[in-house]
Regions:
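Patatin-like phospholipase
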Residues: 126-129, 135-138, 146-275, 285-413
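Glycine-rich phosphate-binding P-loop
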Residues: 82-109, 115
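Gly/Ala-rich beta-loop-alpha elbow adjacent to hydrolase catalytic centers
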Residues: 276, 280
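Cyclic nucleotide-binding regulatory domains
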Residues: 1-38
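Conserved substrate/cofactor phosphate-moiety recognition/catalytic segment
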Residues: 101-134
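A small-molecule sensor/coupling module
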Residues: 28-29, 46-81
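A short hydrophobic beta-strand segment most commonly corresponding to one strand
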Residues: 39-44
Length: 413
């Protein structure tokens, strides 16, 4: 609608109809259809369709099933479907094919049929690409050469696109801009992600904010070369088996999250995405920082249990405390780490009193996002950001499982 952001309602797969509701109701279309990939369309006149329905009632029954399925998907916002064809486009120099081949082997180890394809098939006919999709569970296209024709072809053949850059270098602004332009239909639907590659000895990523500004990805992933756990995590993400952990607020009760994280680790359950609210956000941030069980317990106890961070009592104009001790402890334990520089994708939620809606923090200083998420009204002074007043996320959304679902397709704990 005019004045509103574009919203993805669903994905029409090969062989499925588009515009069936408008055809049956003999009314104008209620949405636009955008070709994310190279497509061939067959137009069926209304009278021909009605004749087919009269000749075989199964046509209308199957169409009704599809319409009901799409209606449910629109309500649950689950219409994007599960992608099975992925593209990997290199930003800058560096070999990309070995990484994609390794991802393919990892996916095959999960029991799927998968193939990795490079520019050697650039001149193949359209039918060939369709046949590859039909005969494999997952298809991975690789574009690492400077051949713009192959890059454009990859962007027109995939369900989801990954730009791949080197995390130890600044983003190549011209290359990233060209990549964003060729992926514009996918980019508009938030179907373009960014992978930053790091050396095996990298302790923590840095400078990721610059990459976000240039590439404008829907999601950011960090991978260390030759790091088995990172490759396995990426394979789970591609196959829809990634695990998202969401931790709610609840004050002192949120300390139970530490035990929950430990139990998941003891059971060998991977944690691939993290999100949280209030104290749950603090614990989730610790996991994203890479804290082990012992370090997590020590830091949380030191910051919030051994001595109270809420004993800097203030004249209660804004809150009962000044909030300075909380600020100091967040700074001590999380430093100047940016959310984009965490090894695992992370978000936390605060309540925006200015707009009356919850606010999701995926960028910026981690400690500032946490400070907003734990700002319990009346106890801590509210946080401010861009002239917005932010308080504890639990005020409006204490369990943001739906936010996590929008980020990944796998199980959510």
């Amino acid at each position: 609608e005019p004045g509103h952001d574009v919203q993805l309602l669903g994905v029409i797969r090969p062989g499925e109809p588009a515009g069936e509701m408008s055809l049956i109701a003999d009314a104008p279309h209620s949405a636009d259809v955008v070709a994310l990939r190279d497509s061939e369309i067959i137009a069926v006149p209304r009278d021909v369709f009605l004749e087919a329905c009269e000749a075989d009632t199964a046509v209308m029954i199957e169409l009704a099933k599809l319409m009901m399925l799409r209606s449910r998907q629109a309500v649950t916002r689950g219409g994007a479907g599960e992608p099975s064809v992925f593209g990997f486009i290199s930003l800058g120099s560096g070999l990309l094919r070995p990484l994609v081949d390794r991802l393919a082997r990892e996916i095959a180890g999960l029991g799927y049929s998968v193939t990795a394809i490079g520019s050697e098939v650039q001149s193949a006919p359209t039918e060939w690409f369709s046949d590859v999709e039909r005969t494999h569970d997952f298809v991975l296209y690789v574009a690492e050469a400077p051949d713009s024709g192959w890059r454009h072809l990859v962007a027109r053949q995939v369900d989801r696109l990954f730009h791949v850059g080197r995390g130890d270098r600044n983003p190549p602004r011209s290359g990233a801009g060209a990549a964003a332009a060729l992926a514009s239909p996918l980019q508009a639907q938030q179907l373009v992600d960014l992978i930053l590659l790091h050396t095996p000895d990298t302790s923590r990523p840095s400078g990721s904010e610059a990459w976000l500004d240039v590439a404008r990805p829907a999601r950011l992933f960090h991978l260390r070369r030759d790091h088995d756990a990172d490759i396995a995590r990426m394979a789970r993400i591609l196959t829809g088996q990634s695990v998202g952990l969401v931790l709610s607020g609840g004050g002192a009760r949120a300390y139970a999250h530490i035990g929950a994280v430990r139990a998941l680790r003891e059971r060998g359950v991977p944690i691939d995405f993290l999100g949280g609210v209030s104290m749950g956000a603090v614990v989730a941030a610790g996991v994203a920082m890479g804290w082990g069980d012992a370090e997590m317990e020590r830091r949380i106890r030191e910051a919030f249990v051994t001595t109270s961070p809420l004993d800097d009592i203030a004249v209660p104009l804004l809150a009962m405390t000044h909030g300075m001790k909380v600020n100091e402890r967040l700074a001590h334990h999380f430093g100047d780490v940016q959310i984009a520089d965490l090894w695992l994708p992370f978000f936390c939620v605060s309540s925006n009193l200015t707009t009356g809606a919850y606010q999701v923090h995926r960028r910026g200083l981690l400690r500032e996002a946490l400070r907003a998420s734990i700002s319990l009204p009346g106890v801590l002074p509210p946080a401010t950001s861009d002239n917005n007043v932010l308080v504890d996320g639990a005020v409006l959304k204490n369990f943001p499982a739906d936010v996590m679902r929008a980020s990944q397709l796998g199980p959510i704990v």
